[in-house]
Amino acid sequence: MWDLFYFKVFFWVVLISLCIFMVHRNGKVANKFRELRSRFQSRFNRHISLNDSFTDDLESGLHSSNFDIISENNNDTRGGLDDISKNEIKQIMEMNNISFDKARLLYMERKFGQNGIAPDGTPIDPKAFTFD
């Protein structure tokens, strides 16, 4: 009887340890937990420390673990993306069924192309001189 009890305790300790390990190892899971925490706080009228311009971006899915707007940025005076950029990135996400990071990369590569810059950041102009 005690053997079964110790086996159950051992099983739960291993299971909980694996869950904790995966949360710390995988940034995406930790980011999801942060996002869920902020949603619970907003539902119960608790203060979320976000700059006002970033709250709409958070609600519309314009964030990721690489572009983290959930972190404390209430002292940040910069604004979020402008409305035209937000709409273009949302369209890219919906049309190509890709994540926010990939849509943001495609958007920036298009903007680079419009301004004479290659996707890798080098100038397209053949007269341009670069240092290696």
From Swiss-Prot:
Pfam annotation, one family: DUF2015
Top-rank taxon, per record: Eukaryota
Keywords, sorted A to Z: Signal
Signal peptide: 1-25
InterPro entries assigned to the protein according to its UniProt record, in alphabetical order: DUF2015
PANTHER family named in the record: UPF0357 PROTEIN YCL012C
Similarity section: Belongs to the UPF0357 family.
Name recorded for this polypeptide: UPF0357 protein YCL012C
Native source organism of the sequence: Saccharomyces bayanus
Gene name, Swiss-Prot/TrEMBL: YCL012C
